[in-house]
Amino acid sequence: MLSAQLEAYLAEINLPATAEQKKQLLDFVGMLNKWNKAYNLTSVRDPEAMLVRHIMDSLVVSPHLQGEHFIDVGTGPGLPGIPLAIMNPDKTFVLLDSLGKRIRFQKQVAFELGIHNISSIESRVEAYQPEQKFDGVLSRAFASIHDMLTWCHHLPAEHGQFYALKGQLSDEEMQQIPAGFVVTETIELKVPRLDEQRHLLKIIKE
């Protein structure tokens, strides 16, 4: 059932996937559902809802990624980082979260599913000082845009971008973007079977 739904959703957003990638995405949902019962990793309890609200909600960003080296800040159980890593094996993803149980889950997922292009790091974002800066800084349900930019300002490389995944955009939040940052693109995203607003904001440092 889930397999057929995933197939249909991927076709709907026109995202090609190999049989192995589809299996990894479904196995990730299975592991998230299993671990969630003990570790409370997400408020979404149903695998079908996870497929829409977590997997597809992450994957609609995939065509918009530019660069090779990304960080997913406040990633939680690995969202959007793990689905994006599965679909972009040529890119690398650092998954950053301050809670150990989430990092343990991510590492187990990477091990069991054979995902080799992610590394999970337990740290608060403002304390994390990477040796190599990032082409893209991803944030989904992590913080307000103002806080994301304030806390993550040190993470992008010279021509790196921030990718803020938001629901409904409020004028108030947009007006609070700190000085020195510019929104270069606002993209309306359509997630299959999700009747809610989704937006991707691309932001650069001036």
From Swiss-Prot:
Alphabetized UniProt keyword annotations: Cytoplasm, Methyltransferase, rRNA processing, S-adenosyl-L-methionine, Transferase
Main location class: cytoplasm
NCBIfam families found in the cross-reference section: rsmG_gidB (TIGR00138)
Places the protein is found: Cytoplasm
CDD domains, sorted: AdoMet_MTases
GO CC annotation terms, alphabetical: cytosol
Function: Specifically methylates the N7 position of guanine in position 527 of 16S rRNA.
UniProt enzyme class: transferase
Molecular function terms, GO-annotated: rRNA (guanine-N7-)-methyltransferase activity
Family: Belongs to the methyltransferase superfamily. RNA methyltransferase RsmG family.
Lineage: superkingdom: Bacteria
Catalytic activity annotation: guanosine(527) in 16S rRNA + S-adenosyl-L-methionine = N(7)-methylguanosine(527) in 16S rRNA + S-adenosyl-L-homocysteine
Protein name, per record: Ribosomal RNA small subunit methyltransferase G
Lineage per the UniProt record: Bacteria, Pseudomonadati, Pseudomonadota, Gammaproteobacteria, Alteromonadales
Keyword hit for Transferase: yes
EC numbers on record: 2.1.1.170
Residues reported in the UniProt entry to bind S-adenosyl-L-methionine: G74, L79, V125, E126, R140
Chain segments annotated as coiled-coil in the UniProt record: none
Pfam families: GidB (PF02527)
Database matches in InterPro entries: rRNA_ssu_MeTfrase_G (IPR003682), SAM-dependent_MTases_sf (IPR029063)
Gene3D superfamilies (alphabetical): Vaccinia Virus protein VP39
PANTHER family, per database record: S-ADENOSYL-L-METHIONINE-DEPENDENT METHYLTRANSFERASES SUPERFAMILY PROTEIN
